[in-house]
Amino acid sequence: MTSDLFSLHAPFRPTGDQPTAIASLIESLQGEHKFQTLLGATGTGKTFTMASVIAELGRPTLVLAHNKTLAAQLCNELRQFFPENAVEYFISYYDYYQPEAYIPVTDTYIEKTASINDEIDMLRHSATRSLFERRDVIVVASISCIYGLGIPSQYLKAAVPLQVGAEYDPRLVIRDLVNVQYSRNDVELQRGRFRLKGDVLEIVPAYEDRVIRIEFFGDEVEALRLIDPVSGEILQSLDRISIYPARHFVTPEETLEKACQQIQTEMEQQVAFLEKNNLLVEAQRLSQRTRYDLEMLREVGYCNGVENYSRYLADRQAGEPPECLVDYFPEDWLLVIDESHVTIPQLRGMYNGDQARKKVLIDHGFRLPSAADNRPLKAEEFWQKVKQCVFVSATPGVWEIEQSEARVIEQVIRPTGVLDPEIFVRPTTGQVDDLYGEIQTRVKLKERVLITTLTKRMAEDLTDYFSERGIKVQYLHSEIQSIQRIEILQALRDGEFDVLIGVNLLREGLDLPEVSLVAIMDADKEGFLRAERSLIQTIGRAARHIRGQAILYADNFTDSMQKAIAETERRRKIQQEYNEKHGITPQPINKRANNAILQFLDISRRLNSQQLEEVYEQAQDLPLEKIPDLIQQLEEKMQEAAKKQEFEVAAIYRDRIQHLRDRLLGHKK
């Protein structure tokens, strides 16, 4: 059941209500409806369903995830389903990013500082290159895809085409490469660089880690080869190739000169406005900064903070939305939004947060008003670019359901036959002793327990209480750093302890098949963590275990509780009837080694530079002069992880580096 474009490889066929969901989604999409929702319960194989839909439709697809970790997991799964097709990964390429900001109260200006991850930048370029050269493309992206990404037409036009047998002056080829931001280095060949030795020109494109070798005979291209950068082995001989720019932002010379004139005019107008309002310091600041930037732009075509002039460099009108990743897709592209109930609110919030920061910079003379157009898309601008979309969630939001109208397609039957958890509501009187008994039962069966509380204090108290009674327990809260969170979750799966307590264990994508019991304390206290959607998601953490149960400790039945229980019971009944009809006995889930937690985040086995860990743990007591040395060592580890495409590991190091830099900055203040 696949188109000629995509080749779906799966060790299983659609089962349960997957065939119906796949057929319904395809029918809806072929009927050219803009919005449809896949309401898929935990463990029902939503990713496989979407892979089947993509394969059948045969259209370039953008899969949007609400964080880098889930994007990485989805990308990995889809690459397994589509090994012969282009499954690309597009997330923010910053290892460290401190946006430019100004705090008027303390008169503190914070300059933009950023560290770009070279490997992720390569993957971003690989994504846009694939979109230009083929149709069998799936790009898995985070929300960063709604930020400006140059102009696709200019990017494509600037590519340097080469063909075997054609004639090119090597000097002109080199000039063209320099014009699209490649640099010459005859000693060390890295991504975005080239070298010329005799009649051989070697380039490492922005989207490759392999070398393209161009062999000239006079002005004729005699051979084009793809070379292994380490061994020098010829991997492939090519007939033709296009070398795409080293950066997505490509500005033709004539556009650059026009942009400089427009920047000059706006600066003069804004300086006059500030002076008229007696804001002389701001006027002087703006004039000085902008004149310096203009000088740099005219001399070298670049300046720090060049993105703030993107309205003019991209030749856009005031208020016109920037072109972003979605503009690199052909017209018939498909959008899939994973965990849409989380991703869509995130999509709405990006623009407002960005504009609030920019307004302060503009008002105080740090930036021209046009800097406000260096921004992410507004939600309505994004939807105008979308032709068709599938929302995917176990608990879709009201907005998604309204937009989908009658096209909400359910997928609640698990191929494994595992039922949704049994739910019990028990009074809060004696709840701790009751829970202790339940935990003992689970421990004897070598199963795991999740307990969610409303306060950090209660989580700590419960942890102490159970620990004193011999239960192997740990707790999770917001102050625990990323690396520790991951290590704790891994240790739970490995059986190093049996009970995990936390304030917010509501983690979409949290995949813990060993958990057979979820206990929700204060389930009747209405609020975000005890809303219907949150309760369903939390109860669902036990939905991968054949003996899954959830206990809600409450003295009242809230509306949210009633709805969550009713929905879970409804799904449980559907699965039960299906199992009886088809003679299915629920089977435990045997997750592959590269499951959702471990496939990108196998921290304890890959990070163990134990000494570095111990030094970092004591960083608060380190003399300030030692901090830069520690930062340097962490940066080396970060780059090493990035080279192995262990991007979440690299991100953990990035967060540590940022924490240490913040300490240094705080001291300077």
From Swiss-Prot:
Keyword ATP-binding present in the record's keywords: the answer is: yes
Q: Which GO terms describe its molecular function?
A: ATP binding; ATP hydrolysis activity; DNA binding; excinuclease ABC activity
Can you quote a single GO CC term?
cytoplasm
Write out the GO biological process terms: nucleotide-excision repair, DNA damage recognition; SOS response
Highest taxon, organism lineage: Bacteria
Motif Beta-hairpin, per the record, lies over: 93-116
Q: Locate the UVR domain: which residues?
A: 628-663
- UniProt-listed Gene3D superfamilies: P-loop containing nucleotide triphosphate hydrolases, UVR domain
The UniProt record lists the keyword DNA damage: yes
Helicase C-terminal domain location:
431-597
CDD domains according to UniProt: DEXHc_UvrB, SF2_C_UvrB
Instruction: Tell me what else is known.
Output: This bacteria is considerably more resistant to UV and gamma irradiation than E.coli; the E.coli-like SOS regulon model is not an appropriate model for DNA repair in this cyanobacterium.
Quaternary arrangement and interactors, per the entry? Forms a heterotetramer with UvrA during the search for lesions. Interacts with UvrC in an incision complex.
Write out the domain note.
The beta-hairpin motif is involved in DNA binding.
What name has this protein been given in UniProt? UvrABC system protein B
What is the species listed in this Swiss-Prot or TrEMBL entry?
Synechocystis sp. (strain ATCC 27184 / PCC 6803 / Kazusa)
